[in-house]
C-alpha cells in the first residue's frame, strides 16, 4: 500500500468520523453544555437577586431600627417631661400642704396664746380680788384702796 493512499484513506475516515460526530455526538454534547450554562447563569442571576434582596433587607432593617430608636427617644423624652411635670405637681402640692399645716399650727398657737392670756387674766383678776379683799380687811379706806385696784385693773 502506498503512503498516499493510506493518508487519503485516513483523511476520508477522519472526515466521515467528523461528520458522524457532528451529526450524532456533537448536538447532545452542545445541548448538555448549553443546559449547564443556562443552569449556571440562572444560579448566578438568582445569587445576584438574593444579594440585592439581602441589601434591601439590610437597608429596611436599618431604617426600621432608626425609626424604632427615634420612637424610643420620643417616648423617653415624653416620659422625662411627664416625670418633671409630676415632680412639679408633687412639689406644688407639698408646698400647699406645708403652707396649710403651718397656717393651722399658727392658728392653734394663736388660739392657745389667747386662751393662756385669758386664763392668766382670770387668775390675775382673782389674785387682784383676793389682794383687794385683804386690803379691805386691813383698812376700810375705800378711796385709797380703789386707786390700787384701778391701777391693777389698768395693768391687766
Swiss-Prot record:
Matches recorded under Gene3D superfamilies: F1F0 ATP synthase subunit B, membrane domain
GO MF, one example: proton-transporting ATP synthase activity, rotational mechanism
Cellular component aspect of the GO annotation: plasma membrane; proton-transporting ATP synthase complex
Pfam families: ATP-synt_B
Superkingdom of the source species: Bacteria
Keyword Phosphoprotein: no
Subcellular localization, as worded in the UniProt entry: Cell inner membrane
Entry keyword set: ATP synthesis, Cell inner membrane, Cell membrane, CF(0), Hydrogen ion transport, Ion transport, Membrane, Transmembrane, Transmembrane helix, Transport
Transmembrane segments: 11-31
InterPro entries named among the record's database cross-references: ATP_synth_B-like_membr_sf (IPR028987), ATP_synth_b/b'su_bac/chlpt (IPR002146), ATP_synth_F0_bsu_bac (IPR005864), ATP_synthase_B_chain (IPR050059)
Topology term for the membrane: Single-pass membrane protein
Primary localisation category: membrane
Assembly, per entry: F-type ATPases have 2 components, F(1) - the catalytic core - and F(0) - the membrane proton channel. F(1) has five subunits: alpha(3), beta(3), gamma(1), delta(1), epsilon(1). F(0) has three main subunits: a(1), b(2) and c(10-14). The alpha and beta chains form an alternating ring which encloses part of the gamma chain. F(1) is attached to F(0) by a central stalk formed by the gamma and epsilon chains, while a peripheral stalk is formed by the delta and b chains.
Protein purpose: F(1)F(0) ATP synthase produces ATP from ADP in the presence of a proton or sodium gradient. F-type ATPases consist of two structural domains, F(1) containing the extramembraneous catalytic core and F(0) containing the membrane proton channel, linked together by a central stalk and a peripheral stalk. During catalysis, ATP synthesis in the catalytic domain of F(1) is coupled via a rotary mechanism of the central stalk subunits to proton translocation.
NCBIfam families: ATP_synt_b, PRK05759.1-2, PRK05759.1-4
Record family assignment: Belongs to the ATPase B chain family.
The protein, known as: ATP synthase subunit b
Organism in which the protein naturally occurs: Citrobacter koseri (strain ATCC BAA-895 / CDC 4225-83 / SGSC4696)
Amino acid at each position: 500500500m502506498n503512503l498516499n493512499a493510506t493518508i487519503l484513506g485516513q483523511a476520508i475516515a477522519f472526515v466521515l468520523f467528523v461528520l458522524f460526530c457532528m451529526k450524532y455526538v456533537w448536538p447532545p454534547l452542545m445541548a448538555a453544555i448549553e443546559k449547564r450554562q443556562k443552569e449556571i447563569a440562572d444560579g448566578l442571576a438568582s445569587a445576584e437577586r438574593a444579594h440585592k434582596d439581602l441589601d434591601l433587607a439590610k437597608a429596611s432593617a436599618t431604617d426600621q431600627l432608626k425609626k424604632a430608636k427615634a420612637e424610643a427617644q420620643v417616648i423617653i423624652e415624653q416620659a422625662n417631661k411627664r416625670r418633671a411635670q409630676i415632680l412639679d405637681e408633687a412639689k406644688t402640692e407639698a408646698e400647699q400642704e406645708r403652707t396649710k399645716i403651718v397656717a393651722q399650727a399658727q392658728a392653734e398657737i394663736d388660739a392657745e396664746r389667747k386662751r393662756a392670756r385669758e386664763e392668766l387674766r382670770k387668775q390675775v383678776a382673782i389674785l387682784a380680788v383676793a389682794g383687794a379683799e385683804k386690803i379691805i380687811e386691813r383698812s376700810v379706806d375705800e378711796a385709797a384702796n380703789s386707786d390700787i385696784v384701778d391701777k391693777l385693773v389698768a395693768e391687766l
